[in-house]
């Protein structure tokens, strides 16, 4: 895949992930699959905060899709913060048997998001 194709698919991925983060995280945490997307003990304030942060990131990823190469730092931040967040949660879920469902829920979702963006982001900035 050449860089032009990567950027086109990257724009599509940013739109899809942006919409998912904006409208999908809160319902997954609260109604659709809390076992795989929420953590115990349930803390409403924390859940609202994390859903708000991801909804905001979703808006900015969606906007970045217009011209992904102008938003490399946002995309790189999304990649690395998702890897770090996913790794921490994976370690916690591995240690805490009550959180094992997260190993097939939010943890792989973060790693998948990071992987897709990493694969599609051209390695060097266009000049």
Positions of PLM-derived features:
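Membrane-helix boundary connector in multi-pass membrane proteins
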Residues: 87-105, 122-123
């Amino acid at each position: 895949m050449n860089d032009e194709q990567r950027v086109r698919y990257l724009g599509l991925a940013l739109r899809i992930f942006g919409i998912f983060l904006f409208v999908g995280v809160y319902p997954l945490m609260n109604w659709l699959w809390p076992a795989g997307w929420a953590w115990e003990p349930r803390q409403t304030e924390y859940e609202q905060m994390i859903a708000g942060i991801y909804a905001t990131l979703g808006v900015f990823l969606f906007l970045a899709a217009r011209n992904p190469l102008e938003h490399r730092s946002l995309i790189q931040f999304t990649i690395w913060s998702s890897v770090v967040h996913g790794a921490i949660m994976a370690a916690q879920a591995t240690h805490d048997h009550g959180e094992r469902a997260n190993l097939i829920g939010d943890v792989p979702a973060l790693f998948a998001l990071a992987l897709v963006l990493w694969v599609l982001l051209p390695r060097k900035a266009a000049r």
